Amino acid sequence: MIQTGSIYRDATMKKPCILCVAITGSLPTKADNPAVPISLQEQVESTQSAFEAGATIAHCHVRNQDQTPSSDPEKFAALLEGLNEHCPGMVIQFSTGGRSGAGTDRGRMLTLAPDMASLSVGSNNFPTRVYENPPDLVNWLASEMKKYKVTPEVEAFDLSHILTAIRMHDRNELY
Protein backbone atom coordinates (compact mmCIF):
# COMPACT_ATOMS: atom_id res chain seq x y z
CA MET A 1 0.00 0.00 0.00
CA ILE A 2 1.12 3.53 -0.77
CA GLN A 3 0.06 6.29 1.61
CA THR A 4 -1.00 9.54 -0.04
CA GLY A 5 -1.96 11.99 2.68
CA SER A 6 -4.55 10.10 4.67
CA ILE A 7 -5.64 7.99 1.71
CA TYR A 8 -4.17 4.55 1.03
CA ARG A 9 -3.95 3.33 -2.54
CA ASP A 10 -3.29 -0.16 -3.80
CA ALA A 11 0.14 -0.13 -5.47
CA THR A 12 -1.05 -2.54 -8.18
CA MET A 13 -2.97 0.31 -9.86
CA LYS A 14 -6.06 -1.59 -10.96
CA LYS A 15 -7.37 1.38 -12.94
CA PRO A 16 -5.49 2.46 -16.07
CA CYS A 17 -3.44 5.60 -15.78
CA ILE A 18 -0.90 7.55 -17.81
CA LEU A 19 2.54 7.99 -16.27
CA CYS A 20 4.61 10.78 -17.78
CA VAL A 21 8.27 11.04 -16.80
CA ALA A 22 10.51 14.08 -17.18
CA ILE A 23 13.80 12.39 -16.45
CA THR A 24 16.10 15.37 -17.04
CA GLY A 25 14.21 18.64 -16.79
CA SER A 26 15.60 21.90 -18.05
CA LEU A 27 17.65 23.05 -15.08
CA PRO A 28 19.09 20.33 -12.79
CA THR A 29 22.76 19.48 -13.31
CA LYS A 30 25.10 16.82 -11.96
CA ALA A 31 26.17 19.36 -9.32
CA ASP A 32 22.55 19.44 -8.08
CA ASN A 33 22.20 15.67 -8.16
CA PRO A 34 24.79 13.26 -9.61
CA ALA A 35 21.95 10.95 -10.72
CA VAL A 36 20.43 13.48 -13.16
CA PRO A 37 20.68 11.92 -16.63
CA ILE A 38 22.39 14.50 -18.85
CA SER A 39 24.08 12.65 -21.72
CA LEU A 40 21.94 11.10 -24.43
CA GLN A 41 22.99 7.61 -23.29
CA GLU A 42 22.04 8.39 -19.68
CA GLN A 43 18.70 9.79 -20.82
CA VAL A 44 17.90 6.73 -22.93
CA GLU A 45 18.86 4.36 -20.09
CA SER A 46 16.86 6.31 -17.49
CA THR A 47 13.82 6.56 -19.76
CA GLN A 48 14.04 2.85 -20.56
CA SER A 49 14.00 2.06 -16.83
CA ALA A 50 10.92 4.25 -16.38
CA PHE A 51 9.28 2.67 -19.44
CA GLU A 52 9.91 -0.82 -18.10
CA ALA A 53 8.38 0.29 -14.78
CA GLY A 54 5.21 1.42 -16.56
CA ALA A 55 5.75 5.00 -17.76
CA THR A 56 3.97 5.67 -21.05
CA ILE A 57 5.09 9.23 -21.91
CA ALA A 58 8.59 10.71 -21.81
CA HIS A 59 8.83 14.51 -21.57
CA CYS A 60 12.26 15.20 -23.06
CA HIS A 61 14.83 17.96 -22.69
CA VAL A 62 18.32 17.84 -24.21
CA ARG A 63 21.52 19.43 -22.96
CA ASN A 64 24.74 20.92 -24.25
CA GLN A 65 28.15 19.54 -23.20
CA ASP A 66 28.26 22.10 -20.36
CA GLN A 67 24.86 20.78 -19.12
CA THR A 68 22.95 23.93 -20.14
CA PRO A 69 19.55 23.49 -21.84
CA SER A 70 19.52 23.08 -25.62
CA SER A 71 17.03 23.14 -28.49
CA ASP A 72 19.45 21.52 -30.94
CA PRO A 73 17.44 19.38 -33.38
CA GLU A 74 20.41 17.02 -33.84
CA LYS A 75 20.45 16.24 -30.12
CA PHE A 76 16.68 15.69 -30.14
CA ALA A 77 17.02 13.44 -33.22
CA ALA A 78 19.63 11.27 -31.50
CA LEU A 79 17.49 11.05 -28.36
CA LEU A 80 14.38 10.18 -30.39
CA GLU A 81 16.27 7.43 -32.21
CA GLY A 82 17.50 5.93 -28.94
CA LEU A 83 14.10 6.11 -27.28
CA ASN A 84 12.31 4.58 -30.27
CA GLU A 85 14.81 1.71 -30.22
CA HIS A 86 14.76 1.04 -26.47
CA CYS A 87 11.23 2.12 -25.54
CA PRO A 88 9.00 0.88 -28.40
CA GLY A 89 5.50 2.27 -28.15
CA MET A 90 6.35 4.95 -25.61
CA VAL A 91 4.91 8.38 -26.40
CA ILE A 92 7.78 10.82 -26.91
CA GLN A 93 7.14 14.44 -25.98
CA PHE A 94 9.71 17.18 -26.70
CA SER A 95 10.00 20.32 -24.62
CA THR A 96 9.70 23.62 -26.46
CA GLY A 97 10.32 25.51 -23.22
CA GLY A 98 12.07 28.86 -23.11
CA ARG A 99 15.07 27.90 -21.03
CA SER A 100 16.57 26.01 -23.96
CA GLY A 101 16.41 28.74 -26.58
CA ALA A 102 14.82 31.95 -27.71
CA GLY A 103 12.05 32.57 -30.21
CA THR A 104 11.59 30.07 -32.98
CA ASP A 105 14.79 28.21 -31.96
CA ARG A 106 12.54 26.62 -29.34
CA GLY A 107 10.59 24.76 -32.03
CA ARG A 108 13.26 23.71 -34.52
CA MET A 109 13.03 20.09 -33.35
CA LEU A 110 9.34 19.86 -34.30
CA THR A 111 10.39 18.90 -37.85
CA LEU A 112 11.34 15.53 -36.30
CA ALA A 113 7.60 14.92 -35.67
CA PRO A 114 7.68 13.59 -32.11
CA ASP A 115 4.38 12.23 -30.82
CA MET A 116 3.87 15.29 -28.61
CA ALA A 117 5.49 18.58 -27.63
CA SER A 118 4.90 21.06 -24.85
CA LEU A 119 3.06 24.25 -25.77
CA SER A 120 3.06 27.01 -23.16
CA VAL A 121 0.23 29.25 -24.28
CA GLY A 122 1.14 32.36 -22.31
CA SER A 123 3.82 34.16 -20.35
CA ASN A 124 4.24 34.04 -16.59
CA ASN A 125 6.66 34.95 -13.83
CA PHE A 126 9.06 32.35 -12.48
CA PRO A 127 10.97 33.11 -9.26
CA THR A 128 14.01 34.53 -11.06
CA ARG A 129 12.77 35.49 -14.53
CA VAL A 130 9.82 35.99 -16.85
CA TYR A 131 8.90 32.93 -18.91
CA GLU A 132 8.07 34.65 -22.18
CA ASN A 133 5.55 33.09 -24.54
CA PRO A 134 4.29 35.96 -26.71
CA PRO A 135 1.22 35.28 -28.87
CA ASP A 136 3.18 35.28 -32.15
CA LEU A 137 5.54 32.59 -30.84
CA VAL A 138 2.71 30.51 -29.36
CA ASN A 139 0.82 30.66 -32.66
CA TRP A 140 3.96 29.74 -34.62
CA LEU A 141 4.72 26.77 -32.36
CA ALA A 142 1.09 25.60 -32.64
CA SER A 143 1.19 25.90 -36.44
CA GLU A 144 4.46 23.93 -36.61
CA MET A 145 2.96 21.22 -34.40
CA LYS A 146 -0.07 21.07 -36.65
CA LYS A 147 2.12 20.97 -39.79
CA TYR A 148 4.17 18.02 -38.46
CA LYS A 149 1.20 16.31 -36.73
CA VAL A 150 2.62 16.76 -33.24
CA THR A 151 0.03 16.66 -30.46
CA PRO A 152 0.47 19.61 -28.09
CA GLU A 153 0.62 19.18 -24.35
CA VAL A 154 -0.88 22.53 -23.42
CA GLU A 155 0.86 24.11 -20.44
CA ALA A 156 -1.41 26.49 -18.56
CA PHE A 157 0.09 28.44 -15.67
CA ASP A 158 -2.97 30.61 -14.97
CA LEU A 159 -6.63 30.99 -15.93
CA SER A 160 -5.90 33.20 -18.95
CA HIS A 161 -3.80 30.38 -20.40
CA ILE A 162 -6.74 27.99 -20.16
CA LEU A 163 -8.93 30.51 -21.97
CA THR A 164 -6.23 30.95 -24.64
CA ALA A 165 -6.03 27.17 -25.14
CA ILE A 166 -9.82 26.91 -25.46
CA ARG A 167 -9.82 29.73 -28.01
CA MET A 168 -7.01 28.06 -29.98
CA HIS A 169 -8.91 24.76 -29.91
CA ASP A 170 -12.15 26.42 -31.03
CA ARG A 171 -10.28 28.05 -33.94
CA ASN A 172 -8.81 24.67 -34.93
CA GLU A 173 -5.27 25.96 -34.31
CA LEU A 174 -4.19 22.89 -32.33
CA TYR A 175 -3.38 19.50 -33.85
Where do the model's predicted regions map?
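Conserved, mostly hydrophobic/aromatic
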Residues: 43, 50, 61, 117, ...
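Alpha-helix-loop-beta-strand connector modules within alpha/beta enzyme cores
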Residues: 21, 69-94, 140-147
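Catalytic alpha/beta core domains of metabolic enzymes, predominantly
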Residues: 116-175
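Glycine-rich, proline-tolerant flexible connector loops at the mouths of alpha/beta enzymes
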Residues: 31, 56-78, 126
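Active-site beta-loop-alpha junctions enriched in small/polar residues
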Residues: 22-26, 63-65, 95-99, 121-124, ...
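Acidic (Asp/Glu)-rich catalytic clusters
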Residues: 14, 51-52, 84-87, 106-115, ...
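Structural preference for beta-strand elements that scaffold enzyme active sites
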Residues: 16-20, 57-59, 89-93, 115-118, ...
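N-terminal small/glycine-rich loop or linker at the start of catalytic domains
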Residues: 9-35, 118-125
